[in-house]
């Protein structure tokens, strides 16, 4: 019974990628992906995902938010990244909860605490949300950020999500469609297409946009891919923007490939995406944080990334991995 309930919870946030006439679609056609219940059956049959004895152990680092490091990037965990540039602090896909789920007692569970937690952050000026899946849009996290001392950050969200924020009492929200942009305190904020999908309930699949974000400042150009399968969208983004000082690409939640390929890149595809967008450096995200999302070990993505870097002739610094909470200073342009 417990397995059946957990599968239903997962179905609310996974399922198939489809689009009716009134629903958003990806830019580049792909087969409609079905087979969620087949995947769940295979997990049950094969005892996946397999976990190490004693559970996962990840080393965390103490974040450094000193002004001397600006611009800088801190990986808090999963797709939550703090970028500091020009006196601004910008947070991506804030997820600080114990579970990535519509309920608190089931669903993918955190194996390492957010580093730092919400109370350890500097004042957040802006938040960008890639899409509405529970591991990227967390109700408790965004409501606490909106109530931070000194006032709410400005939330930049995909088309169709502003109404959800309004229902939570969050008013400082800018909603954008693909290729639209706004300027905020000297920072250009662009919403760009990536290949993924959206779903938050059993009936709202693909009723809101999904995408990545480009942040452009005189001191830093940054591309946040959010959650994405590999597609020609990355080449399109390079054609528009030329390249980036830093990109953040997902490298985890990719097995089994027959089911996950459309929606989640693997490390080899992430390396190709790094090349496609012409990033000087890339940061690995979307791995090592929540257990139970897909079949591969949480330890596997950075190991495979190291192999793919070597094959592509990239250095560790060109596509780097941070510990949870670790801050990296970025060279000025």
Predicted regions and their residues:
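Sec-dependent signal peptide recognition
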Residues: 2-7
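Hydrophobic h-region of N-terminal signal peptides that target proteins for export
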Residues: 10-16
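Metallo-beta-lactamase
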Residues: 16-110, 114-120, 158-226, 245-252, 304-326, 330-332, ...
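Cap/insert and terminal regions of metallo-dependent hydrolase folds
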Residues: 17-28, 121, 126, 133, ...
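Catalytic core of the metallo-beta-lactamase
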Residues: 32, 81-84, 183-245, 261, ...
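Active-site metal-binding motif and surrounding structural segment of the metallo-beta-lactamase
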Residues: 34, 105-156, 172, 242-248
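A short acidic, amphipathic alpha-helical/loop segment
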Residues: 140-145, 164, 168-169, 233-237
């Amino acid at each position: 019974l417990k397995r059946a309930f957990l599968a239903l919870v997962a179905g609310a946030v996974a399922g198939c990628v489809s689009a009716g006439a009134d629903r958003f679609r990806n830019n580049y056609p792909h087969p409609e992906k079905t087979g969620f219940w087949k995947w769940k059956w295979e997990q049950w049959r094969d005892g996946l995902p397999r976990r190490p004895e004693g559970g996962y152990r990840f080393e965390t680092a103490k974040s450094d938010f000193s002004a001397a490091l600006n611009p800088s990037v801190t990986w808090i965990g999963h797709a939550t990244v703090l970028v500091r540039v020009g006196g601004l602090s910008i947070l991506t896909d804030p997820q600080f909860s114990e579970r990535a789920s519509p309920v608190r007692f089931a669903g993918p569970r955190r194996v390492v605490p957010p580093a730092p937690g919400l109370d350890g952050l500097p004042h957040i000026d802006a938040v960008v949300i890639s899409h509405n899946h529970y591991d990227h849009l967390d109700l408790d996290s965004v409501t606490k950020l909106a109530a931070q001392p000194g006032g709410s950050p400005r939330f930049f969200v995909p088309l169709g999500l502003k109404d959800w924020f309004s229902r939570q009492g969050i008013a400082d929200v800018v909603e954008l469609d693909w290729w639209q942009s706004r300027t905020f305190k000297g920072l250009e904020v662009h919403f760009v297409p990536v290949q993924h999908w959206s779903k938050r309930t059993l009936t709202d699949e693909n009723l809101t946009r999904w995408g990545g974000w480009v942040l452009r400042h005189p001191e830093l150009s940054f591309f946040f891919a959010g959650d994405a399968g590999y597609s020609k969208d990355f080449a399109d983004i390079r054609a528009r923007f030329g390249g980036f000082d830093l990109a953040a690409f997902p490298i985890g939640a990719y097995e089994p490939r027959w089911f996950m390929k459309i929606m989640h890149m693997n490390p080899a595809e992430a390396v190709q995406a790094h090349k496609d967008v012409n990033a000087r450096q890339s940061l690995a995200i979307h791995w090592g944080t929540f257990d139970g999302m897909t079949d591969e070990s949480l330890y596997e993505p950075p190991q495979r990334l190291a192999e793919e870097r070597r094959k592509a002739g990239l250095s560790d610094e060109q596509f780097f991995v941070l510990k949870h909470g670790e801050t990296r200073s970025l060279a000025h342009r």
